[in-house]
Regions:
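Macromolecular interaction modules
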Residues: 40-292
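N-terminal secretory signal peptides
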Residues: 1-14, 36
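A ubiquitous, low-specificity "background" feature that marks scattered single residues
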Residues: 20, 36-37, 253
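Signal peptide processing junction and immediate N-terminal pro/mature segment
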Residues: 30-41
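Cleavable N-terminal signal peptides
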Residues: 21-22, 32
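Short alpha-helical interface patches
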Residues: 7, 28, 132-134
Length: 292
């Protein structure tokens, strides 16, 4: 081999090495803007800043007898809920007293006597996700309570439970001034219901495209959450959160009137089967609402 041939061979080898590196770089660039972006996000194991941290909701509706009510409320607020919030994945708890006591005659309510009818109190517990409520399950937590705690829970009348996962959320105008983070707002309206399967897609579209944006455009709305059930009678729920009772009374009905749950002006509400005595408008009794 001549000196000239050796130089030519070396130049060709360097060219192939450079070209190969460029090709690998091109492939890596393609992956970085395609599938590997998703892999990177997954491998980081961190939640996006705009993604809600409390996707799980444990909702309980119930009534209480007059006798022993104050003792029960003291136990719930001072003992049971603070202990519950020390568990991994549990983020917040809010206890509400229902303000509307008349059942709406324009809605279809379930007639099955097996579905509990409590509604005067609503207890909401937020968690990282609905899987938190599977280990341990609420029934396991409550069975492990000391005797006094089990006696307190036994005071609940018509108790109905749903364990839910959030499927859609809209943050409202009042969210910027809401200083309590994910904690349930001072005033809520919560509805739980079932829907014939042939209307479920339209219902979802109606909430996401129409109702949620409209409600979150109201001045007193903190946030609105559409939820689906992991356990419990109702397959669906909607949670509207407001900065105050006065704001709810001003904004809720007028907003609903112009935001039907459906497509092209159609409403699926007549097809829904609501939980007993629902939906429920309620104000928070714990944690206490700070005075303005």
């Amino acid at each position: 081999m001549t000196k000239h041939d050796e130089v030519a061979r070396r130049q060709r080898r360097n060219f192939l090495r450079t070209a190969g590196g460029a090709a690998l770089g091109l492939v890596a660039t393609k992956d970085a803007h395609g599938q590997s972006e998703h892999a990177k996000a997954a491998s980081q194991g961190t939640r996006r800043r705009d993604e809600p941290s409390d996707r799980g909701l444990w909702a309980t509706w119930y009534d209480l007898p007059d006798t022993g009510r104050d003792a029960y409320l003291s136990w719930l607020h001072e003992t049971y809920l603070p202990a519950l919030l020390k568990r991994p994945g549990y983020l917040w708890a809010a206890h509400y007293a229902t303000q509307n006591t008349e059942t709406r005659s324009d809605l279809h309510h379930v007639e099955d006597p097996k579905v509990p009818t409590g509604f005067r109190y609503v207890l909401l517990i937020g968690a990282k996700d609905a899987g938190v409520f599977g280990n341990p399950a609420p029934v396991e937590i409550q069975a492990a309570l000391p005797e006094q705690g089990r006696k307190m829970l036994a005071m609940r009348i018509g108790e109905r439970v749903n364990l839910m996962t959030e499927t859609s959320r809209c943050d409202g105008h009042a969210g910027n001034s809401h200083k309590e983070g994910p904690l349930g707002a001072p005033c809520i309206q919560i509805g739980s219901f079932n829907c014939p399967v042939e209307y479920e897609e339209e219902m979802l579209a109606g909430y996401v495209q129409v109702r949620l944006p409209a409600m979150c455009g109201a001045g007193s709305c903190v946030r609105t959450r559409k939820l689906n059930s992991a356990a419990g009678w109702a397959k669906h729920a909607i949670l509207y959160e407001f900065a105050s009772l006065e704001g709810f009374q001003r904004d809720y009905a007028v907003t609903n009137a112009h935001a039907p749950i459906g497509l092209k002006g159609h409403s699926v509400v007549p097809m829904l089967i609501h939980a007993p005595n629902g939906p429920n408008m309620a104000t928070r009794i714990w944690p206490p609402v700070a005075k303005a």
